[in-house]
Design a protein with these regions (language model features):
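Eukaryotic scaffold repeat domains enriched in small/polar residues
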Residues: 4-10, 19-405
Length: 405
């Protein structure tokens, strides 16, 4: 099993129909071996997770990751809305651990210590839990039960001339980060790869002790660059089982594939131009469009070849399935905007366990986790023609703790 925030995936179909489980399940025997012209599909489990203790309020679920026991970790921003505050419901701890049945088995984290603006989450090959924060300058490594083991960067001090967080494009410090979005660990040697993508636009690499090794990337649209602006570019870093690093370049609507030293191997488009909608930030071209983008997070199927890549498209409230054996062709997808089971609002993270169950997290407006169970395959000839989503949820104003994704 490959440990990252997820591990396998199986995936997808007719937008809402299959995601909501209206189709009769296909044979489970085929769920691990895809064939040309077939798309893996999921059915939503509307009863996952089970009610959490003491009416905890998780707020926005920014990151989702899975350990070697198929326990699901979520990182929660704990931002109660007005109704929740009026009832006096307690805030959940920043990190909550669930078993596969949806029971809370542990929870931990000191709100004063964890990164501001909790964001990405990763479980490494030793079952340590890593978290990043896009309102801060740190990435942290915790033991499985929540003991802080390592911190890269300085809390409240970012890579900028004044140390302020969110000042764009410094891209220079070997010791400071600038609102990192995500983190991944190389199981071969323990090196740490950081998507330093909200203030900076780089992948920064550290050894297992936190010593800076190298970096690559800058703001732009050329191959090897990451989209300008403050929306998390790069937004995810995920290793495949060949040791290649897949990096989400969200507002450029693409996944960029690098070797461990930053040599670009491939650029994979993800529905270009469809995930950008009117909003407060605007694109660098001055169009007044929201740079939310379509390449937010990803994971792979658990078969030996990792045939399928699953990409979380926040701008279109969809999950796309790519066939890597067919030149990273998009086979299909599921999801639509909404708040019912199987729908997404600010679809932010995706993770898959060793059984092929997919777990998702939603931030602004969504504020929840969902579970999708694999149910065989469907022929691509039954898939709907894609239409870009006109829906978006307004992103919040600028602030120290970014909530946009």
């Amino acid at each position: 099993m490959t440990i990252s925030r997820a591990v396998y995936a199986g995936a997808v179909v007719l937008a809402s129909v299959v995601a909501l489980g209206a189709w009769n399940p296909l044979g489970q025997a085929n769920a691990r071996e895809g064939k040309s012209g077939q798309v893996p599909r999921f059915v939503v489990d509307p009863l996952w997770p089970k009610p959490i203790p003491a009416r905890w309020v998780t707020g926005e679920v920014a990151g989702t990751c899975i350990d070697s026991r198929d326990h699901i970790f979520t990182v929660n921003r704990r931002n109660a809305d007005a109704l929740e505050t009026s009832f006096g419901w307690p805030l959940a701890p920043p990190v909550v651990e669930y078993d596969g049945e949806g029971n809370v088995v542990n929870a931990w984290g000191n709100p004063a210590v964890v990164p501001t603006g909790l964001h990405g989450c990763f479980v490494d090959y030793q079952d340590n839990v890593w978290i990043a924060g896009n309102g801060d300058g740190i990435v942290q490594k915790y033991s499985h039960d929540g003991t802080l083991l390592l911190q890269i960067g300085t809390k409240g001090h970012c890579d900028s001339p004044t140390g302020a967080c969110g000042v764009p494009d410094s891209n220079s410090s070997p010791i400071y980060l600038n609102e990192p979005a995500d983190v991944s660990v190389d199981p071969a040697n323990g090196d740490v790869y950081v998507a330093d993508g909200y203030g900076n636009h780089r992948v920064a690499v550290f050894d297992k002790n936190g010593r800076f090794l190298r970096q690559w990337g800058s703001a732009g649209t050329a191959p090897g660059q990451f989209a300008p602006g403050g929306g998390g570019h790069p937004h995810c870093v995920v290793f495949d089982n060949r040791g290649l690093l897949y990096v989400c370049d969200r507002a450029n609507d693409r996944i960029q594939v690098f070797d461990k030293f930053g040599n670009l191997k491939e650029v994979i488009p993800v529905k270009p131009g469809t995930g950008s909608v009117p909003g407060p930030y605007g694109n660098p071209d001055g169009s007044g469009r929201n740079a939310v983008g379509s390449a937010n997070d990803l994971d792979f199927s658990i078969d030996r070849d990792q045939q399928y890549m699953f990409v979380n498209d926040v701008g279109n409230s969809s999950l796309w399935v790519f066939d890597r054996l067919l030149g990273n062709r998009i086979l299909g997808g599921f999801g639509r905007p909404g708040h019912q089971a199987g729908e997404f609002t600010l679809f932010h993270s995706v993770a898959v366990d060793s059984k092929g169950n997919m777990y998702t997290g939603e931030t602004v407006g969504g504020r929840r986790s969902q579970k999708f169970v694999p149910r065989g395959f469907i022929s691509t000839e039954h898939l709907e023609t894609f239409r870009g989503s006109p829906h978006y949820d307004p992103l919040p104003g600028k602030g120290a703790e970014r909530r946009d994704d």
